[in-house]
Curated annotation (Swiss-Prot):
Modified residues (Phosphoserine): 337, 512
Biological role stated in the UniProt entry: Component of the CTLH E3 ubiquitin-protein ligase complex that selectively accepts ubiquitin from UBE2H and mediates ubiquitination and subsequent proteasomal degradation of the transcription factor HBP1.
Annotated SMART domains: ARM
GO CC terms in record: cytoplasm; nucleus; ubiquitin ligase complex
Residues bearing PTM N-acetylalanine: 2
Listed InterPro entries: ARM-like, ARM-type_fold, Armadillo, ARMC8/Vid28
Protein name: Armadillo repeat-containing protein 8
Main location: nucleus
SUPFAM superfamilies associated with the record: ARM repeat
Gene: Armc8
Keywords: Acetylation, Cytoplasm, Nucleus, Phosphoprotein, Repeat
Organism: Mus musculus (Mouse)
Subunit relationships: Identified in the CTLH complex that contains GID4, RANBP9 and/or RANBP10, MKLN1, MAEA, RMND5A (or alternatively its paralog RMND5B), GID8, ARMC8, WDR26 and YPEL5. Within this complex, MAEA, RMND5A (or alternatively its paralog RMND5B), GID8, WDR26, and RANBP9 and/or RANBP10 form the catalytic core, while GID4, MKLN1, ARMC8 and YPEL5 have ancillary roles.
Localization in the cell: Nucleus; Cytoplasm
ARM repeats: 51-92, 95-134, 138-176, 178-217, 224-265, 269-309, 313-352, 374-413, 416-455, 458-497, 501-540, 543-585, 588-627, 634-673
Length: 673
């Protein structure tokens, strides 16, 4: 909504507006300052809790006039303060109200007001700023535009408990990401806010706590600092632990648990520290019980999922705390009975947000089952859980779908479950549907899971192949998203492992040699490694090697040459030499190496390389080329001897590396046989 409306629109909009609303605005223009003040006070009383009145006054142009009065040097402090109060009340209406206030540049005006010496006016400006900055329509960046604002807010923290509460609330809402964390940290946020945790005001303690949770999130620098901060002779983590005791308000318990969780994940607190194992984790499990409110259960489960995600031991402890796995099953039966919730408004709210519970449960199940086979088994054996997760993967909410697919991905790491539950529930069917049409964030997880379902021992591999997976995966390799390219090629690599010639031919045909070579020159190392892995799996078993090299030999040899000449890692070059070793194992394919002096020189070079892995891979090539039971072995041996390969073999047979020594001796025996 614009700040001032054009004249032609006024009549249609104003038909809704009462004369009394216009009367309030007209009084703001009275030449008598006392009448203006009374007009603002009356306006304040009129708009409290009345959204329609707020909208009317905004349409009638009250905001620019209030801002003008607020900024006028001739206005009394009382008038300025009352203007700030009314503007704060208007901001508490709808999101459209906030947009209108932002369009009128309210933030610079209020920030200017903070330079006043009058505390009541400062508090009114801060209260209004707090309301505006906590609205989802306000860009956080507006707090950081002027570099003098943050230091001034830090200085105002000492003025009163209200300045402390509002400023901390503004910081916790406007601190989004590492850049904001760094700005606040560099301006002394930790030192300025730490002592507020012992404030006599609950609201101040709570807002300070929220500040620390957003400052510490994924931030090792802040987290490492927090660990050593003393407040009244007590370390900050000890204060957080006291705040998550059962006798404290739930909001405080949860936020303290978040602070400790984030500090732990940022590496500032060990995962086996008693404050995590005996305090934070049990507190978060408590938040998952059905006695808690929906929001608390969601936040508790999501924070716990984040805490235990990388640590097997914490996953095991959580899985046996308060029957957590069974407790999470209740997240899907919500609300359990309508009569249990007497507040109809609450019931309506919870029905609208029940999907958040499912999302949180899937996230926590995914973390619990990330590593341990027994935990995965427990999750899957929980009443109809596989059906619920499979259903979740096709829900309309993107967040629920993502969490459900993550959960399936976590469970798909189990060989046992791939062979049993995943087959019983034909998980591959909904997964293929998800892969047809989903946002990238879901595609990345779903394609990762497909990689697992395509492992050679998975019974789902056959039906997936029959349902057009090759084309789908080849399509993923052309994505602009590197994670999707990696997963597409990884799944093809798993598909090609010990596969029949027909499947390999399908992969090569669908992928096209052009795309294969594009992937071999991909800037992402993971893509390159998986493409080499695919090539290695395609070039296995002699008939397949000979067939593929007869049609694509020239291009493959060209790609191999480029990689061996390029600036690549040891791992990439090792994989490439292993591909050459596979080619050297072909019956007719090996001639492509023997007739390529450039490649032979490269193999010789890598036999003398300083890295043992590369020497070993080059040795495999030589062994396969000199194997004397095969036709033409004598000519090959002679050519390699002339190149000085035998001398290198003698040298390597004296190597301190036992592996290298054995391989060299085996190759030399081919010459003696």
């Amino acid at each position: 909504m614009a700040c001032l409306l054009e004249t032609p629109i006024r009549m249609s909009v104003l038909s809704e507006v009462t004369a009394s609303s216009r009367h309030y605005v007209d009084r703001l223009f009275d030449p008598d300052p006392q009448k203006v003040l009374q007009g603002v006070i009356d306006m304040k009383n009129a708009v409290i809790g009345n959204n329609k009145q707020k909208a009317n006054l905004i349409v009638l142009g009250a905001v620019p006039r209030l801002l003008y009065l607020l900024q006028q040097e001739t206005s009394s402090t009382e008038l300025k303060t009352e203007c700030a109060v009314v503007l704060g009340s208007l901001a508490m209406g709808t999101e459209n109200n906030v947009k209108s206030l932002l369009d009128c540049h309210i933030i610079p005006a209020l920030l200017q007001g903070l330079l006043s010496p009058d505390l009541k006016f400062i508090e009114a400006c801060l209260r209004c700023l707090r309301t505006i900055f906590t609205s989802p329509v306000t860009p956080e960046e507006l707090l950081y535009t002027d570099a003098t604002v943050i230091p001034h807010l830090m200085a105002l923290l000492s003025r009163s408990r209200y300045t402390q509460e509002y400023i901390c609330q503004i910081f916790s809402h406007c601190c989004k990401g590492p850049d904001h964390q760094t700005i606040l940290f560099n301006h002394g946020a930790v030192q300025n806010i730490a002592h507020l945790l012992t404030s006599p005001s609950y609201k101040v303690r709570m807002q300070a706590l929220k500040c620390f949770s957003v400052l510490a999130f994924e931030n090792p620098q802040v987290s490492m600092t927090l660990v050593n901060v003393l407040v009244d002779g007590e370390l900050l983590p000890q204060i957080f632990v006291k705040m998550l005791q059962r006798d404290k308000p739930i909001e405080m318990q949860l936020t303290s648990a978040k602070c400790l969780t984030y500090m732990c994940r940022a590496g500032a607190i060990r995962t086996d520290d008693s404050c995590i194992v005996l305090k934070t984790l049990p507190c978060l499990v408590r938040m998952c019980s059905k006695e808690r409110l929906l929001e608390e259960r969601v936040e508790g489960a999501e924070t716990l999922a984040y805490l235990i995600e990388p640590d097997v031991e914490l996953q095991r402890i959580a899985s046996i705390t308060d029957h957590l796995i069974a407790m999470l099953a209740d997240y899907f039966k919500y609300p359990s009975s309508v009569s249990a919730i007497t507040d109809i408004k609450r019931l309506d709210h919870d029905l609208k947000h029940a999907h958040e519970l499912r999302q949180a449960a899937f996230k926590l199940y995914a973390s619990l089952g990330a590593n341990d086979e027994d935990i995965r088994k427990k999750i899957i054996e929980t009443e109809t859980m596989m059906d619920r997760i499979v259903t979740g993967s096709s829900e309309s909410s993107v967040k629920v779908r993502l969490a459900a697919v993550r959960c399936l991905h976590s469970l798909s790491r189990s060989v046992q479950q791939l062979r049993t539950s995943f087959q019983d529930h034909a998980v591959w069917k909904p997964l293929m549907k998800v892969l047809q049409n989903a946002p990238d964030e879901i595609l990345v997880v779903a394609s990762s899971m497909l990689c697992n379902l395509l492992l050679e021992f998975s019974p789902s591999k056959e039906p997936i192949l029959e349902s057009g997976a090759v084309e789908l995966l080849c399509g993923l390799t052309q994505s602009e998203n590197p994670a999707l390219r990696v997963n597409g090629i990884w799944a093809l690599m798993n598909m090609a492992f010990q596969a029949e010639q027909k499947i390999k031919a399908d992969i090569l045909r669908s992928l096209s040699t052009e795309q294969l070579f594009r992937l071999l020159s991909d800037s992402d190392m993971n893509v390159l490694m998986k493409t080499l892995g695919l090539l290695r799996n395609l070039l296995s078993t002699r008939p397949h090697i000979d067939k593929i090299m007869s049609t694509h030999g020239k291009q493959i040899m060209q790609a191999v040459t480029l990689i061996l000449e390029g600036e690549h890692s040891i791992e990439v070059k090792e994989q490439t030499l292993c591909i050459l070793a596979n080619i050297a194992d072909g019956t007719t394919a090996k001639e492509l190496i023997m007739t390529n002096d450039d490649i032979l020189q490269k193999i010789k070079y890598y036999m003398g390389h300083s890295h043992v892995k590369l020497q070993l891979a080059a040795m495999f090539c030589i062994s396969n080329l000199t194997w004397n039971e095969e036709e033409g072995s004598q000519e090959r041996q002679d050519k390699l001897r002339d190149m000085g390969i035998v001398d290198i073999l003698h040298k390597l047979s004296q190597s301190a590396d036992s592996n290298l020594c054995d391989k060299a001796k085996t190759a030399l025996q081919q010459y003696l046989a």
